[in-house]
């Protein structure tokens, strides 16, 4: 799979874990204004009552700040922060070890909770609801149930695929928070803040050029900023201008809306091979030699949000925006066909 090597992948990489660029408080955090305002209220109320914050579920595409917000919440609550991910918790004993080491009101963050083992998920229910572990010790006739009391903790979980969560698990989160893609203006503020922390002189136009190509995602904005800095330093530029940012990102094959070669292959395949669609996701995955999950989680969310493609009952369809971006004319019958298709959708 080619996706991990992509510069504009929103998935985590080692360089993205640099804490110096991350905001340390809700006031420093840029974007997600409604979510931040609500979290401030919930955190303040929990602190005033001396109680553990209710369990929180963050939902949204990768790279929007779910992990950062969880860390900030623990910091503002004045408690310890523990972090893991769904695939790492392979068996009930792994979860038990995590939960029994938590202190009162601590925050446990589970990323990719939709990938949690179903057997482990069953153990999590009483832990979240009653702060108890109900474990089966031994096997066969000698097996017995053991209840272990836990400190009252806050589970903060993150998922990119809300539909993959079971209803019993989803219903146990008292505070659901949906995160959305960032505006160019918000990303520009994030880029300028990152440049200041790097001691990197940058013009407003330079910051905006990076923000425009960051796919609405702070993690990608930070990565593009680091790569543009490399080009600027080697060129011995006094500051990152729009021209320097444009040249660097163009050389890195990131176009003016943040699409790379894989995105263009996706759009071109639908346009050229299937006349603009509709075409099913499995056909697209086979044509690109990419897993379906990667297409649905990584490639498509930003395209859909920006109006480049439509999902219909019969498959993906290119919009007029996509045809214009490709520099192609849609088939003459496309407009009438799409009109009928979306009527069926209604």
UniProtKB/Swiss-Prot annotation:
Keywords: ATP-binding, Cytoplasm, DNA damage, DNA recombination, DNA repair, DNA-binding, Hydrolase, Nucleotide-binding. DNA binds at residues 292, 311, 316. Residues 183-253 are annotated as: Small ATPAse domain (RuvB-S). One of its GO terms (biological process) is DNA repair. Residues 1-182 are annotated as: Large ATPase domain (RuvB-L). It is found in: Cytoplasm. Mg(2+) binds at residue 67. It is an enzyme of class 3 (hydrolase). It catalyses: ATP + H2O = ADP + phosphate + H(+). Its main location: cytoplasm. Pfam families: AAA_lid_4 (PF17864), RuvB_C (PF05491), RuvB_N (PF05496). GO terms for molecular function: ATP binding; ATP hydrolysis activity; four-way junction DNA binding; four-way junction helicase activity. Its EC number is 3.6.4.-. Residues 256-346 are annotated as: Head domain (RuvB-H). Has 3 domains, the large (RuvB-L) and small ATPase (RuvB-S) domains and the C-terminal head (RuvB-H) domain. The head domain binds DNA, while the ATPase domains jointly bind ATP, ADP or are empty depending on the state of the subunit in the translocation cycle. During a single DNA translocation step the structure of each domain remains the same, but their relative positions change. PANTHER family: HOLLIDAY JUNCTION BRANCH MIGRATION COMPLEX SUBUNIT RUVB, PTHR42848. HAMAP family: DNA_HJ_migration_RuvB. The RuvA-RuvB-RuvC complex processes Holliday junction (HJ) DNA during genetic recombination and DNA repair, while the RuvA-RuvB complex plays an important role in the rescue of blocked DNA replication forks via replication fork reversal (RFR). RuvA specifically binds to HJ cruciform DNA, conferring on it an open structure. The RuvB hexamer acts as an ATP-dependent pump, pulling dsDNA into and through the RuvAB complex. RuvB forms 2 homohexamers on either side of HJ DNA bound by 1 or 2 RuvA tetramers; 4 subunits per hexamer contact DNA at a time. Homohexamer. Forms an RuvA(8)-RuvB(12)-Holliday junction (HJ) complex. HJ DNA is sandwiched between 2 RuvA tetramers; dsDNA enters through RuvA and exits via RuvB. An RuvB hexamer assembles on each DNA strand where it exits the tetramer. Each RuvB hexamer is contacted by two RuvA subunits (via domain III) on 2 adjacent RuvB subunits; this complex drives branch migration. In the full resolvosome a probable DNA-RuvA(4)-RuvB(12)-RuvC(2) complex forms which resolves the HJ. Belongs to the RuvB family. This is Holliday junction branch migration complex subunit RuvB. It comes from Rhizobium etli (strain CIAT 652).
């Amino acid at each position: 799979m080619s996706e991990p090597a992509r510069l504009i992948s929103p998935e985590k990489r080692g360089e993205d874990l640099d804490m110096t660029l991350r905001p340390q408080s809700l006031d420093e955090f840029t974007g997600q204004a409604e979510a931040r305002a609500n979290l401030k209220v919930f955190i303040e109320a929990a602190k005033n009552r001396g109680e553990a914050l209710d369990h929180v579920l963050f939902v949204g595409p990768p790279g929007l700040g779910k992990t950062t917000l969880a860390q900030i919440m623990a910091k503002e609550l004045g408690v310890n922060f523990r972090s893991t991910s769904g695939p790492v918790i392979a068996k009930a004993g792994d979860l038990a070890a995590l939960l029994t080491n938590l202190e009162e009101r601590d925050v446990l963050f589970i990323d990719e909770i939709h990938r949690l083992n179903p057997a482990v998920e069953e153990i999590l229910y009483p832990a979240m609801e009653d702060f108890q572990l109900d474990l089966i010790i031994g096997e066969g006739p000698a097996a017995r149930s053991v209840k272990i009391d836990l400190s009252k903790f806050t589970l903060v979980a993150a998922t990119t695929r809300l539909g993959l969560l079971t209803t019993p698990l989803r219903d146990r989160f008292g505070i659901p928070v949906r995160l959305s893609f960032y505006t160019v203006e918000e990303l520009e503020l994030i880029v300028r803040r990152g440049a200041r922390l790097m001691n990197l002189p940058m013009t407003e136009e330079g910051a905006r050029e990076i923000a425009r190509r960051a796919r609405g995602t702070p993690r990608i904005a930070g990565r593009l900023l680091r790569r543009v800095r490399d080009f600027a330093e080697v060129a011995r530029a006094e500051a990152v201008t729009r021209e320097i940012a444009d040249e660097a990102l163009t050389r890195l094959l990131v176009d003016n809306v943040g699409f790379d070669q894989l995105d263009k292959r996706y759009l071109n395949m639908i346009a050229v091979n299937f006349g603009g669609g509709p075409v099913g996701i499995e056909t697209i995955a086979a044509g690109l030699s990419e897993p379906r999950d990667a297409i649905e989680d990584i490639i498509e969310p930003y395209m859909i949000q920006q109006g480049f493609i439509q999902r219909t009952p019969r498959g993906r369809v290119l919009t007029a925006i996509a045809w214009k971006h490709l520099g192609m004319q849609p088939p003459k019958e496309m407009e009438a066909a799409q009109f009928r298709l979306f009527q069926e959708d209604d």
